[in-house]
Amino acid sequence: KKLTPLLLYATVEGAHRFFGFFDTSPFSFFLIMFLLFFWCLILHYKNIGLSLFACGGIANAIVSLINGGRMPMLGITAVYSIYQPMTDKTIFPFLCDWISSPFRHYLLSFGDILLAVGITIFLIQGLAGLWRNLKNKIKI
């Protein structure tokens, strides 16, 4: 039950990245993402990892939907499938991709950071629960 939103997210994201779905309509991509993350937040509001994951996704979807269906990114000059240049007319620029990543040459948004932290916490909680169950079964 807890993995359902993550699996749906991976499916939609994979369909976009690998098969090119939503390239002609990024607005629908971010609308689906918004609805998916909102659903995740409602179902799992007590789980801090999934809640942070959902809030990050909602932040990314909102800034993209408000700015015409594409995520504004600092430093680019052309419009790509889901990205557009950040300008003076960009709404909520603090939620756009502008944070320099320590890995490679990627730019991150505040929502991306929440997504990563949320997934990390969710996995740590899951592994801790697995370890606890295993420890109880073999009586360490």
Language model features: what each stretch is:
Residues 48-55, 70-78:
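A cytosolic-side transmembrane-helix exit/cap motif
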Residues 72-109:
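Extracytosolic (periplasmic/ER-lumenal) interhelical loops and adjacent juxtamembrane/interface segments
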Residues 1, 38-48, 121-130:
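Structural signal for the C-terminal ends of transmembrane alpha-helices
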Residues 9-18, 56-66:
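Aromatic-anchored segments of alpha-helical transmembrane domains
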Residues 23-32, 105-117:
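Membrane-interface loop-to-helix entry segments
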